[in-house]
């Protein structure tokens, strides 16, 4: 089974509505697979990282509220040998360093159509 990280942008620019939409998507994903949730703003609070077990339902939660640095979850994923990472974000931060795992992005329509940086990685827009 692939080791997947879901990095959730907790920065102040991510609205509560967007955070709720992200958790809605994750509740759907949890019907299919287990994954590791990696919350971040400018850093990853490692005591807040947890495994979301297959079949669990969770409510949206915000555990921090600073700026945004995509290098924080990228470094965490690289250090912990994940196979893939999906970053849930509003895309409002500079482009991160390279990731050893396959990386993709999930954002809203605005973030997908007007991202802060260009990437060849897959970007999925949710409503």
Feature locations, PLM:
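Acidic, low-complexity intrinsically disordered regions
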Residues: 1-127
